[in-house]
Amino acid sequence: MLKLAIGGILCFISAYLGIIGKSYYDKRYRYLSDFNDFLLLLIDGISYAKDRLPEITKKYIASSKGEFSRNLNNYIVVIESTQEKEKISKCFDSKYLKKIDKAYLSEFFTALGKFDYDTQLSRLNLCKAEMEKTLIKAEKDCKSTGNLLSKLGLLLGIAIMIILA
């Protein structure tokens, strides 16, 4: 009876760890998807509506939830007080992003608003093209690796239970 109880607990722990792994990939995809949505809003706001950058950003923050929105809010606070590169890069230091994604976001938001209209628009379109590739890869990772981790966690838990029984 004790072995069965321990096996059940270990099965639960293993399945829970698998779900946490899946959650990581889901949240990473959501974060990058939110950034892509912001990027599209930014391109539309700059090219068609001719809005200013803080207005576009505050409009996005008001209509969105999630970690990217919170990081964007921190970015607005930092931009209004100072423009130090180190503080800007800390705004987008999410545990769900890879190092290359963090560096990319830091570079993007540091350079945002520092160019003339045409250059800024071409950089945004280039960023949009790169982000589409990254988003496709993140979605693929979410569907394959994330789902695999949750199933593998449950399967490992059942295997532990069988071994202990």
State the predicted function of each range.
Residues 50-117:
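Glycine- and small-hydrophobic-enriched helix-loop-helix hairpins
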Residues 1-3:
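N-terminal hydrophobic targeting signals that begin at the initiator methionine
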Residues 6-77:
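Juxtamembrane/interface alpha-helical elements of multi-pass membrane proteins
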Residues 63, 70-71, 133, 152-153, ...:
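Short alpha-helix boundary/capping motifs
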Residues 99, 113-154:
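Membrane-interface, cytosolic juxtamembrane amphipathic helix immediately N-terminal to a transmembrane helix
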